[in-house]
From Swiss-Prot:
<dbReference type="GO" id="GO:0110152">
    <property type="term" value="F:RNA NAD+-cap (NAD+-forming) hydrolase activity"/>
</dbReference>
<feature type="binding site">
    <location>
        <position position="247"/>
    </location>
    <ligand>
        <name>Mg(2+) 1</name>
    </ligand>
</feature>
<dbReference type="GO" id="GO:0046872">
    <property type="term" value="F:metal ion binding"/>
</dbReference>
<feature type="binding site">
    <location>
        <position position="180"/>
    </location>
    <ligand>
        <name>Mg(2+) 2</name>
    </ligand>
</feature>
<feature type="binding site">
    <location>
        <position position="224"/>
    </location>
    <ligand>
        <name>Mg(2+) 2</name>
    </ligand>
</feature>
<keyword id="KW-0479">Metal-binding</keyword>
<dbReference type="InterPro" id="IPR039039">
    <property type="entry name" value="RAI1-like_fam"/>
</dbReference>
<dbReference type="GO" id="GO:0000166">
    <property type="term" value="F:nucleotide binding"/>
</dbReference>
<feature type="binding site">
    <location>
        <position position="248"/>
    </location>
    <ligand>
        <name>Mg(2+) 1</name>
    </ligand>
</feature>
<dbReference type="GO" id="GO:0004534">
    <property type="term" value="F:5'-3' RNA exonuclease activity"/>
</dbReference>
<comment type="similarity">
    <text>Belongs to the DXO/Dom3Z family.</text>
</comment>
<dbReference type="GO" id="GO:0034353">
    <property type="term" value="F:mRNA 5'-diphosphatase activity"/>
</dbReference>
<dbReference type="GO" id="GO:0006402">
    <property type="term" value="P:mRNA catabolic process"/>
</dbReference>
<keyword id="KW-0694">RNA-binding</keyword>
<keyword id="KW-0378">Hydrolase</keyword>
<feature type="binding site">
    <location>
        <position position="222"/>
    </location>
    <ligand>
        <name>Mg(2+) 2</name>
    </ligand>
</feature>
<feature type="binding site">
    <location>
        <position position="274"/>
    </location>
    <ligand>
        <name>substrate</name>
    </ligand>
</feature>
Length: 375
């Protein structure tokens, strides 16, 4: 029987920035997109591709262009807890239960997924980068019918950081959304529409499967746009798996030495892992000055991000694999479908606490009912 509190073993010391790391990359299948959905302006789940965007046909708007356009009228994404992101995935599973759910081999009265983990790409990315990051991070997980469901939870440090975010910081966050507006269109080969406020609440999400060293994962990932000259039938799974999605990023034009070090040690690792987890091979990076004027657009091959960097892509993948494997082992030992394990990464430790009670649940009752589980 597992303790109600303790530590999860993760390889914090396996690699230090700049050191050699010779362990080969763990086996991993190519991430496969099995479906898509949208989150509309009201933050409601929509089982279609209505929020999808296409990479706009070139030539793009002439440079430089102003990322501050319409900044006062931006429609910002409301503050939500991590359970809400997971619930979007659960709603997708409900809508596609015929394809995704099957009888549990251990109890025919219950249904389960062909996955060890159900989560979000952003959580996997952050876990991969944790060994190089001193900031705190927290997840909650529960085991139901053999599947681990995992969402994020804000730490006190993150809550304080978000509460104290300055207007200038919020504006810089909005620059990234405005850059997306300049480079995307609602139609294939369409032109960008940049004279309307950016709606940061809308999302287009892909649902992916992959196998990391025997750990099967099902996760959602927000996608910026698809690079296609023809309209896409997002309902066709064969088409989905062959699409070329691209990521759009903004960064600093003419970086100073500190910014260059930060990019090489941290930001490039985040960009690489985010793209790697969904099989994206191309980034378009808008380089902007301190006033939000975009000066240049670079096309970057994602594979080059991992070259000649102080971090190790292999170490990041092994860190994720070890954490997921040991987290599931802990949950299996706890053997309680209503127990929630809260894991806090802080000061090079991954401490856990077992939480019980309705106030701690991360799975809504309707989802438990869907899987025929009763308390």
């Amino acid at each position: 029987m597992a303790e109600n509190a303790g530590f999860i073993s993760v390889p914090w010391g396996q690699h230090k920035l700049g050191a050699m790391y010779n362990t080969p990359f763990p086996s991993i299948s190519r991430p496969k997109c099995i479906g898509v959905c949208s989150i509309n302006a009201s933050r409601e789940f929509v089982d279609d591709a209505s929020c999808a965007s296409y990479l706009a046909g070139q030539p793009w708007p002439p440079l430089p262009f102003d990322l501050n356009g319409g900044i006062e009228d931006v429609i910002r994404k409301p503050v939500e807890n991590g359970k809400r992101d997971l619930e979007i995935m659960l709603t997708y599973i409900k809508q596609h239960q015929k394809e995704l759910l099957r009888q549990s081999s251990s109890d025919a009265r219950n249904l389960r997924l062909d996955s060890d983990f159900v989560t979000l790409r952003g959580i996997l990315r952050q876990i991969m980068c944790l060994q190089y990051d001193n900031r705190s991070f927290r997840v909650k997980a529960t085991l139901l019918n053999g599947n681990v469901y995992m969402c994020k939870e804000e730490t006190p440090e993150q809550q304080l950081e978000n509460a104290n975010m300055s207007r200038a910081q919020r504006v810089m966050c909005s620059w990234g959304f405005k850059f997306e507006q300049y480079l995307t269109s609602a139609q294939a080969q369409g032109k960008p529409v940049t004279n309307v406020p950016v709606n940061e609440a809308e999302e287009f999400m892909g649902v992916y499967r992959t196998n990391l060293a025997g750990i099967l994962m099902l996760y959602g990932a927000e996608l910026d746009c698809v690079d296609s000259k023809e309209p896409v039938d997002f309902k066709d799974c064969r088409v989905l798996d062959s699409l070329k999605f691209v990521e759009l990023k903004t960064s600093v034009f003419n970086m100073n030495p500190h910014q260059i070090r930060t990019f090489k040690s941290f930001k490039s690792a985040n960009w690489w892992s985010q793209s790697f987890l969904v099989g994206i091979t191309t980034l378009y990076v808008g380089l902007r000055d301190t006033k939000g004027m975009l000066q240049r657009i670079d096309e970057i091959d994602v594979a080059t991000l991992a070259r000649n960097k102080p971090w190790s892509a292999s170490a990041m993948a092994w860190y994720l694999e070890q954490f997921l494997r040991n987290l599931k082992k802990l949950l299996v030992n706890i053997n309680d479908p209503f127990a929630v394990v809260q894991v806090t990464f802080l000061n090079k430790h991954a401490s856990y606490e077992v939480l019980r009670g309705p106030e701690h649940q991360i799975l809504p009752n309707w989802y438990r009912d869907l899987l025929k589980t009763r308390s």
